[in-house]
Design a protein with these regions (language model features):
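Flexible mid-to-C-terminal extensions adjoining Fe-S/redox cofactors in radical SAM and related proteins
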Residues: 4-5, 337-422
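N-terminal [4Fe-4S]-dependent radical SAM core
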Residues: 3-31, 45-80, 123
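Conserved alpha-helical substructure of the radical SAM core
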Residues: 65-179, 187
Length: 422
């Protein structure tokens, strides 16, 4: 008789009387009414529903799935470009030193040549993903255009799929540039708005100290009102003790501005000690709490649910993921830019010269025995943050049943379950 695999996350909603089943490996999710099945045991004792769940991968052996995760990882090449390492902002909590500028043309051509060679030589490769980061990437829009056009062409010739995302402060993201990026298949955008205008303008300022809030909001309103596409625009808020109390008003404001546009999603992150600056931080993770508040107010907040998605462990822990600096330095992580352990190599003449020992610090198998019985093991692989494990030697496990159950409820509230049995 089939049993649910250990990689299936089980939750419940006592208020609505539903059982939740989430297949972390495939992303398939099922909500089951307790009027039909009172508990998981009664589900497992029913041949009909178990046959259905088995067909959706809910009964697979977890140990075999781990290898499948790594096999899937080998089919993708992910490159993050520090396309411009300077910035037009000087955020108070930023960890970057802004010692470099636009990516050199020699480096740009070298990366394109590297990608072309990988596509030619690696028969396993099925997908190429490019991420634009900085500094502020839109300070080098021409570089983004040139690389995108060339790599898209390479993928089309070889029949590979392609995708792209950008992390930008939003100040330069007017409608014209947004439409240009969309044509270049940039489909995911992350823009930070740190609370209300007063708070945002106290810490996310231009080089000259002037505020940036209204310009960003105006850009996004223009995009919302005058463009139509299926992109995702994540509005990120960094939360600290000095802006936490103002979050309800901030969230309400963003919902009033963008709540009717399905492309916009509100994300929340605790401000972290990313550099050597003394910054007050909130010790408790408030991201889930604020996501719940957003949904209760009628907004959309799906970003936090990434923790439940397949292959959602950190890019830095993936073998086929590289961060390329503007001068050709190769990193694994975009945060520990000044840590020698993160300087894993250099781009030379269209080839990545990688220090295998340094790279292994990030990509080596870090799973423990209990990872194999953990419901989110196939998504996490104990690599949710390799930098944390590397720097602080702390346990990297993120399993918290109460929080995961709240995430399942958040999925339900946003009608994100794949199937309903009621």
């Amino acid at each position: 008789m089939n049993k649910l695999s250990s990689h299936v996350l089980v939750g419940e909603n006592q208020e609505t009387n539903f059982i939740y089943l989430m297949n972390i490996y495939t992303g398939c999710s099922v909500k089951v009414s307790r009027r039909i099945f009172k508990d998981v045991e009664s589900i497992e004792n029913n041949d009909e529903i178990m046959a259905f769940l088995d067909s959706e991968g809910f009964c697979k052996n977890t140990a075999n799935l781990i290898q499948e995760v790594y096999d899937e990882e080998s089919k993708q090449l992910n490159i993050t470009f520090l396309i411009h390492e300077n910035c037009n902002f000087r955020c108070t909590y930023c960890y970057e030193k802004f010692e470099k500028n636009a990516m050199e043309r020699e480096v740009i051509d070298g990366v394109i040549n590297y990608i072309a060679k990988r596509i030619q030589d690696d028969s396993r490769l099925e997908h190429v993903h490019l991420a634009w980061f900085g500094g502020e990437p839109l300070l080098n829009l021409k570089g983004i255009e040139y690389i995108s056009e060339n790599v898209i062409r390479l993928c089309e010739i070889s029949n590979l799929s392609y995708s792209s995302d950008i992390t930008t402060n939003g100040f330069l993201l007017n409608r014209r540039i947004y439409e240009k990026l969309t044509k270049l298949q940039v489909t995911n955008y992350q823009i930070t708005i740190d609370g209300n205008q007063e708070h945002h303008d106290s810490q996310r300022v231009l080089k000259n100290g002037k505020g940036t809030y209204q310009r960003i909001i105006d850009n996004l309103l223009d995009i919302s009102k005058n463009t139509k596409d299926s992109n995702l625009i994540a509005l990120r808020t960094n939360v600290a003790p000095d802006n936490f109390e103002s979050m309800p008003k901030h969230i309400t404001k963003l919902i009033s501005l963008f709540g009717e546009d399905e492309r916009f999603d509100l994300n929340f992150h605790n401000v972290g000690n990313w550099g050597d600056k003394c910054i007050d931080i909130i010790k408790n993770n408030v991201a889930l709490e604020l996501s719940e508040l957003t949904v209760s107010l009628g907004g959309k907040s799906e970003g936090i649910l990434w923790n439940l998605m397949p292959n959602s462990y950190c890019y830095a822990g993936k073998k086929n993921n590289f961060v390329i600096g503007s001068d050709g330095m190769v990193y694994k992580c975009t945060v520990l830019l000044y840590d020698e352990r993160n300087h894993i190599g250099n781009l030379e003449n269209g080839k990545l010269k990688i220090d295998d020992k340094k790279e292994s610090l990030w990509v080596a198998d870090k799973m423990t025995d209990r990872c194999f019985s953990c419901p989110i093991g196939t998504a996490c692989l104990n690599k949710k943050c390799p930098a944390l494990l590397l720097s602080k030697k702390v346990e990297n496990c993120l399993y918290n049943h109460e929080e995961l159950n709240r995430m399942l409820k958040l999925m339900d509230q946003q009608n994100l379950f794949t199937y309903t049995v009621a």
